[in-house]
């Protein structure tokens, strides 16, 4: 996270304007500009655990990770720099949360890639902080306004839910497959054997649908779920509770906070990080799985058929199987044997 994103490069064109400002950085913080920009004071709030990991090393307690920002997170700030995410409901949640806490008169900057839909910030904030475009470069837009009225923020109003085969799935903005079960997860679910036992880890759990569906036909499994996203962690907890399923849920950057070994690791790993395609998480998942599987345990993942996972699976486990596939997706299985590299 040393190279700056295009959005940060646009902000750097205005770095002189920020030297006397007490800035809160928030939104899609994909680099460490919040820790490096010359300001009077800097804070950062993120819903992404992996971004908090990087920023907290340099900013300490001034970098915060949570679903909802609190008054302490924005204390003494007179400027908000908000990085627009690719997901508009996510931006709505975060901006309404932050603007409900910041004092009237706060300088508001919104920056983002044009293809992410950053233009819609003008309409979203029209009643609270009317924005004007002040720069356009690197296929990004930078908008500025001043907070004129605090919105009323109620996190409960952002919850959604849907049903899958009689199961209730709770969701929040920014959670993968917020509006329904994706095709890849459906394919992975179709391969899970009823009456499975043992410890199961769901990495990148999203709204928790894989785990609750698995637990319904295999009630003796012991579930652990993790995700980098604070909305996903909270959504998974709510999904488990809504279906009467027990499990431990926590934030983790793939295996960073995971302890112990499991009989099965399941995942529909992400390959988009913000607006960029990224295979890092899935490759970290495959290579790290051998340190968290019991002997004879298995890794089972679903992925777009075009992604180059077979080589990483073979390199790590010695072999792999494709146990289900469609034109777009494949479900891979790899077993922890003596052939597997022990990490």
Swiss-Prot record:
EC number: 2.1.1.172
Places the protein is found: Cytoplasm
Gene Ontology annotations for the cellular component aspect, listed alphabetically: cytoplasm
Coiled coil: none
Gene3D superfamilies from the UniProt entry: Vaccinia Virus protein VP39
Catalytic reaction equation(s): guanosine(1207) in 16S rRNA + S-adenosyl-L-methionine = N(2)-methylguanosine(1207) in 16S rRNA + S-adenosyl-L-homocysteine + H(+)
UniProt subunit comment: Monomer.
Name of the featured protein: Ribosomal RNA small subunit methyltransferase C
Species the sequence originates in: Escherichia coli O157:H7
GO MF, one example: 16S rRNA (guanine(1207)-N(2))-methyltransferase activity
